[in-house]
Amino acid sequence: MAAGRMILDVGCANGDILAPLAKVHEIHGVDIAPGLVERAIKNGIHAVCHNLEGGPLPYPAGKFDAIFCGETIEHQVDTDWLMFEINRVLKSGGKLVLTFPNIRTILGLGMMLFFDLPPMYAARYRSMHFRDFTLRTIKIVLKAHGFRFERAIGSAFYLPKIEEFWSPLATYLPSWAYTVVVIATKQTDSIYSSESIMPTRLY
């Protein structure tokens, strides 16, 4: 990506992830926690405090060349509103990099099959995660909101004691990785409806 681009970090926390890019790009960020926003500003991020479910992102349509949304989508009750707003402030042809905790993991399937427990990082009782995703459902979400899926990369497998041995394979088997990085391109504008319901049949 050429220098001088406008990039938004949705759910930026303390800004550590995109701070290295602030030397060559204009990085903006939003987060709900005032203390984290203050730290993000110190890291060179143009950060503001904002509740993602409390109203529109505080930016005009088509402002950003790229958007990063890391480990945030699972914390939102209204997934469609989040994706609509990301689409709105992203330029046509702009890139979205989205990461999420994948519930379709070897350990997660074992927890459900043998212990009658939800997978790690799932929307469990008293969890801060409100929505569960797999790579397939994320692709459905992206398509529903005007994005073209480009590629997915798995970050690691969670397999105690043998994680270091198996984790390199996650790059090539993202649908089994416990964290997935997805890259997508905005093709069309999104339409939001508070009554929209994702189908629960076999997609």
Predicted segments, located by residue:
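Class I SAM-dependent methyltransferase SAM/SAH-binding core
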Residues: 14-55
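Local beta-strand N-terminus motif with an aromatic residue
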Residues: 4, 64-65
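A short His-aromatic
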Residues: 71-75
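Residues at the starts of beta-strands that form the adenosine-phosphate
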Residues: 6, 26-28, 148
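Conserved class I S-adenosyl-L-methionine
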Residues: 4-13
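Short conserved loop adjoining the S-adenosyl-L-methionine
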Residues: 56-61
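A conserved beta-strand element that flanks and buttresses the S-adenosyl-L-methionine
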Residues: 68
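S-adenosyl-L-methionine-dependent methyltransferase catalytic module, highlighting the catalytic core
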Residues: 16, 32, 39, 77-85, ...
